[in-house]
Amino acid sequence: TMARAPNLFTIGGESHRAIESLPGLHPSAHGWASNQLSASDASPEVIAAVRHSFAQSLRDRDGVAPRPGQPVRLLEKTPKNTLRVPFLREVFPGAQFVFLYREPREVLASMIEAWGSGRFRTYPDLPGWSGLTWSLLLVPGWREYRDLPVEELVARQWATTLERLLDDLESVPASSIAPIRYADFLAQPQAEIERLCARLQLPWDVALGTLPPSRHTLTKPEPDKWRKHEDVLSRVLPKVEPTRLRVEAFLQRLG
């Protein structure tokens, strides 16, 4: 939705290739540890290569590339970048981070469906992994997930991601973080997108009607869709409760 803001540029999709195709940035270059990248991965050569990789594909909401020398505000929304905040701050000094938060029960239900669908496979030939093809983020400690039921796997995947993200955001100025709750956005999309853009000092001139499903959505979003997986979720939600509480405290501090 934010890609419809004037004077905002995107590369038209997620940035898997724009980053992981560059030498040293694919997980295989780090022993398949995870998708995590740190500030130390951002050498001057890497910074230049990443910026060039993005610049080649930049388009605004009308599909127009930036003019030579035109200042660019880039919108990037690849989930893997949740594990790359320190790296991104080196590549894009002054970066602002939109923290889109969704309740764990809803996220975990969607993740269970994503793993089962086969549409979100990220590393089909992940060394040392067996069972369902690895899907979504490659998180630190993933090797410990072998032989886990999928609900346990996604619970750990989510909690690990959020814990690392919160650790990294602690060093980011609060003025550079813009929180938004998924449920609030679905309930009041116009008000929430205007509030978010105001916080980011972005203009907004679009009247939102009914929101179309994301192109990555498997089934239509509904508040109680998670209940399809209620039985298995009841076993893992208590395990992610400490992370949920930490997120809530963080959001409260941001205001």
Put a short name on every predicted segment.
Residues 5-6, 92, 172:
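Acidic-histidine catalytic/liganding microenvironments
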Residues 12, 74-77, 99-101, 179-182, ...:
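Short beta-strand segments
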Residues 1-59, 215-218:
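PAPS-dependent sulfotransferase catalytic core
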Residues 17-20, 82-84, 105-110, 116, ...:
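Short catalytic/ligand-binding loop motif for oxyanion handling, primarily in non-cytosolic enzymes
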Residues 54-84:
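Glycine-rich phosphate-binding loop used to anchor ATP phosphates in small-molecule kinases
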Residues 119-125, 129-255:
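PAPS-dependent sulfotransferases, especially Golgi type II membrane carbohydrate sulfotransferases
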Residues 77-78, 88-114:
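Conserved phosphate-donor/acceptor-positioning beta-strand/loop module used by diverse small-molecule
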Residues 21-25, 88, 109-114, 119-123, ...:
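Short aromatic-enriched loop/helix-cap "lid" or pocket-rim segments at secondary-structure transitions
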